[in-house]
Amino acid sequence: MVHMHITAWALGLILFFVAYSLYSAGRKGKGVHMGLRLMYIIIIVTGFMLYMSIVKTATGSMHMWYGLKMLTGILVIGGMEMVLVKMSKNKPTGAVWGLFIVALVAVFYLGLKLPIGWKVF
């Protein structure tokens, strides 16, 4: 399940940047954007399944940290969607990019710091 979740995130980020480049070039990126929305659903479902499997075995404050990581992941998805919608409507995206970057860094940090992630930190 972890590999499916990571693969969904990788595909989601790739589709996000492809849709962003299409919108910034003035082309229609609606099809890629819809594919990205499908990836959002897969990311949320696999993340929730991972969270539920962790709840069964986690001890101490691990529930809180994984819950925080799940909420931060939803913020990343929200930031991605807001950037693309504002780009498609030719509105400024500066603040939304800030939200997206901060949430992405936080979710990567939590993902690498917590026990299921890689042992980088």
Swiss-Prot record:
The chain crosses the membrane at residues 6-26, 38-58, 65-85, 92-112. Its main location: membrane. It is found in: Cell membrane. It is a multi-pass membrane protein. It holds the Pfam family DUF1516. GO terms for cellular component: plasma membrane. Keywords: Cell membrane, Membrane, Transmembrane, Transmembrane helix. It comes from the Bacteria. Belongs to the UPF0344 family. This is UPF0344 protein BCG9842_B4136. It comes from Bacillus cereus (strain G9842).
